[in-house]
């Protein structure tokens, strides 16, 4: 073995973990020209979907659109490997419309591996990283001596040392992971794969604290043993919809149906009688699980008045018999799991291929991170994905992209890219993570955003693709396609605004008859489209629109016009927030004297001494409530100063 001071290999950036966060981070840094190594415990399980074989859903699809708009990869792969697509919340407003894709999990992983293997500047390595290597230096600030810690590299389980200028940890559920079935447990990051040992202790030694969370996954059953004729069918209804804005992305996968069954009174009785055998209710573990993806036993306990719960049966791929039993995760013993499954209609003779299990793991509370996802404690150490306390492939991928972007910018001595709540769901999620003391896995939700009508999936490219191009992740071909779309949107909006119909026109009479809505004198097509009972599909029927216009342009224009008033109000709110962000903060402010601030906010504000309100809003531990309190305090202070000035002027004049 080489001396630890003599590295086996050197890289600009090392990514630890090959899940969805790690893949986005590694591809990002390599595409931006930095030599990158992606380390993972198992190279055959890169970008694996250990739980639900699906991408998207409410708020999650918006995240995927945003990642793609910036130049990330998850949206393209989800589109290419989708075996079913549906639009969720289609009957509601566009702010909550959500695309969801059932993917072929093996095909998804295979294609991601191919992309990684063919990305310039990127090396793949199978090894367990057990130690972070740092170098310490002394700095002076305000005549005070400070010790700083900066990343130098990593060591593997077998003692090999790799040098790196920057590290991104994307370890998922693998840090000291332990899976549970009933009262039996074993060390594992997920079923069939060993946990990551040693790295947690290395983090502790460097001053980064970790805590424990829990998640779980349901059983997989053999589709040949299911009576599908007893189940409700759920076909693919949106195969023409895409996460990616790249016009070259296509899907050639066969489309399949999912099916729906329900729990029965017998299911509930069996669960209640065996609650004491589960890891949580039996007292074997006390880690918090995800609120929005509860186990079936949690549902039975917390919603005791419900006689039945919907369960979805989802194929894991085209060439596998495995069916994912969505909504039925459990920690019950294996033999009871099979009995439980057989209480469900259509599954009374089912064969279980893999049992459900719970997994608990170490995570890094994200209040220890900056908005860039760099750790506060150690320079050039970034953290992204489930290790930051989130749940979901989409949340992980978004963080991986952000960490990758900012790791490269730090090495280039550029300011980090900070995503604001007003600009993206990515920004909403990161702001929530670094300012809230979360004690359960975090899932992105549309309700978490104050600007959800502005932050839709369909306009993610309008919001973020210029930034992706500026960073260097959107290539010239994508950029030209984006500019062409923007031109089409502008031209179509202008055409609708300037095309008038007279009430005497034949087509106007037909519109009046069909819609039951009178046209007085004359009106523009734009004004017509604002009416709730008229849509672009009607314009196409009346031959009032170019039928060759892409669906993305048609949808974008219609939403912009129908919700114009709401969008203007939301834009005004955002502009006001942006103006507030420029409000200066004196370095003389003693935040300990502002009683309305939380203790953590006072401590961090005093430590960092932000120069303006915008910088204060990016400090970990400073919540939205703290920012409001600070604004009120500043306003009161301004009023007091105005009164003092006015009083002094009166004295002088007298």
From Swiss-Prot:
- Identify the Gene3D superfamilies for this entry: FAD/NAD(P)-binding domain, GidA associated domain, C-terminal subdomain, tRNA uridine 5-carboxymethylaminomethyl modification enzyme MnmG/GidA
As for subcellular location, the record says: Cytoplasm
Q: Which cofactor does it need?
A: FAD
Where is NAD(+) bound in this sequence? 289-303
**GO cellular component, as recorded:** cytoplasm
Could you give a single Gene Ontology term from the biological process aspect? tRNA wobble uridine modification
Q: Name one Pfam family in it.
A: SAM_GIDA_C
Q: What InterPro entries does this protein map onto?
A: FAD/NAD-bd_sf, GIDA_C_N, MnmG, MnmG-rel, MnmG-rel_CS, MnmG_C, MnmG_C_subdom, MnmG_C_subdom_sf
Q: Does the keyword Membrane apply?
A: no
The UniProt keyword set, sorted, is:
Cytoplasm, FAD, Flavoprotein, NAD, tRNA processing
Which annotated residues bind FAD? Answer: 17-22
One GO term in the molecular function aspect is: flavin adenine dinucleotide binding
Q: Give the UniProt family note.
A: Belongs to the MnmG family.
Query: Oligomeric state and partners?
Result: Homodimer. Heterotetramer of two MnmE and two MnmG subunits.
Its biological purpose: NAD-binding protein involved in the addition of a carboxymethylaminomethyl (cmnm) group at the wobble position (U34) of certain tRNAs, forming tRNA-cmnm(5)s(2)U34.
**PANTHER family to which the protein is assigned, alphabetical:** GLUCOSE INHIBITED DIVISION PROTEIN A (PTHR11806), PROTEIN MTO1 HOMOLOG, MITOCHONDRIAL (PTHR11806:SF0)
What name has this protein been given in UniProt? tRNA uridine 5-carboxymethylaminomethyl modification enzyme MnmG
Name the species this protein comes from. Answer: Prochlorococcus marinus subsp. pastoris (strain CCMP1986 / NIES-2087 / MED4)
Q: What is the lineage of its organism?
A: Bacteria, Bacillati, Cyanobacteriota, Cyanophyceae, Synechococcales
UniProt lists the gene as mnmG
